[in-house]
């Protein structure tokens, strides 16, 4: 069993504070996106698999440290669970690699907006494979998500036209990586849902197995597909890039921990709304820290993406309060 340790000591007022847990969750999410973007934006960076391996290694070591302190409990690695969970690892590696590649080529606001499309794929995947349903309000949020993505693309194209040379292609390969990422992310979530029932994993079990099983896969792919020459390693593994990778790996654990913390001290309803509202500061961080397009269409797409997240969160809450099955939309 994996679980969070509840602090009953002198700092219990902090451990049981809703606003602090929400703030910690939002800060961790922003930090992870910003540090990942910083690394992949470094001049000549081309070792995404190594970056992901370092992050996974940091996650595993931090989990062991938290278990030593008594703040996390998770199952030890065993052959049966590893065999059952390994198919998930393949989807995970595909998901995080395509995520890093899309973030490398797309601005943070556009990346954040397009990630919403994964929600649509997951929702209809649940309709197809688990007998779920899509309500009218959820469908409305999906339409807003698609609209925000279209507007974001137009804003990006508008910005490219101003900076690109005459006759240069305006196609951004980041959109291809984003499309693959949405598909692989949805597949990862849907397959993991089935496997969790098989293994009965909890949050920290899932994080531990995801990271420790992905490490050899990431390292093998790096050796096969990336340049391990001394010159390239020196260029990619600078002090700044490695520091950012370590911070990113630590924030991944923080996000998982803060998610459970937020649900414990507030409610699942509050947490789902925070997740929707959190899209805005993540998108804005791209405008503040990086050279993201700053035209009307780009700003408007952020607003639409933010609105779609709120509508979706409210729709999910209403669905939980009124669990009668509605007719599946196919």
UniProtKB/Swiss-Prot annotation:
This is GDP-mannose transporter. GO terms for biological process: transmembrane transport. Its main location: Golgi. It is found in: Golgi apparatus membrane; Cytoplasmic vesicle membrane; Endoplasmic reticulum membrane. It comes from Kluyveromyces lactis (strain ATCC 8585 / CBS 2359 / DSM 70799 / NBRC 1267 / NRRL Y-1140 / WM37). InterPro entries: SCL35B1-4/HUT1, TPT_transporter. One of its GO terms (cellular component) is cytoplasmic vesicle membrane. Homooligomer. The lineage of its organism: Eukaryota, Fungi, Dikarya, Ascomycota, Saccharomycotina. The chain crosses the membrane at residues 14-34, 49-69, 82-98, 105-124, 139-155, 171-191, 204-224, 242-262, 270-290, 295-315.
């Amino acid at each position: 069993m994996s679980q969070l340790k509840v602090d009953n000591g002198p700092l219990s007022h902090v451990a049981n504070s809703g606003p602090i847990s929400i703030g910690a969750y939002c800060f961790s999410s922003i930090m992870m996106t910003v540090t990942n973007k910083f690394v992949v934006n470094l001049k000549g960076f081309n070792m995404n698999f190594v970056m992901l391996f370092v992050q996974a290694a940091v996650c595993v070591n931090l989990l062991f440290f938290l278990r030593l302190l008594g703040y996390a409990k998770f199952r030890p690695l065993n052959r049966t669970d590893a065999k059952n969970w390994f198919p998930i690892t393949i989807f995970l590696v595909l998901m995080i690699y395509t995520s890093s590649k899309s973030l490398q080529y797309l601005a943070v606001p556009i990346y954040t907006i397009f990630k919403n499309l994964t929600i649509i794929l997951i929702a209809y995947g649940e309709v197809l494979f688990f007998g779920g349903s899509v309500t009218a309000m959820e469908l409305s949020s999906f339409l807003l998500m698609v609209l925000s993505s279209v507007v974001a693309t137009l804003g990006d194209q508008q910005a490219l036209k101003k900076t690109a040379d005459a006759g240069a292609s305006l196609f951004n390969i980041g959109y291809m990586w984003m499309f693959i990422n949405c598909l692989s992310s949805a597949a990862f979530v849907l397959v993991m849902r089935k496997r969790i029932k098989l293994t009965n994993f909890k949050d920290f079990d899932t994080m531990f197995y995801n990271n420790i099983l992905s490490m050899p896969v990431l390292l093998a792919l790096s050796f096969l597909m990336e340049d391990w020459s001394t010159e390239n390693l020196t260029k990619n593994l600078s002090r700044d890039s490695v520091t950012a990778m370590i911070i990113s790996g630590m924030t991944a654990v923080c996000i998982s921990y803060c998610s459970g913390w937020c649900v414990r001290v507030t409610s699942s309803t509050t947490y789902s709304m925070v997740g929707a509202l959190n899209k805005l500061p993540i998108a804005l961080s791209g405008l503040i820290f990086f050279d993201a397009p700053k035209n009307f269409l780009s700003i408007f797409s952020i607003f639409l993406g933010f609105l779609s997240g709120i509508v979706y969160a409210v729709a999910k809450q209403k669905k939980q309060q009124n669990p009668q099955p509605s007719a599946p939309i196919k």
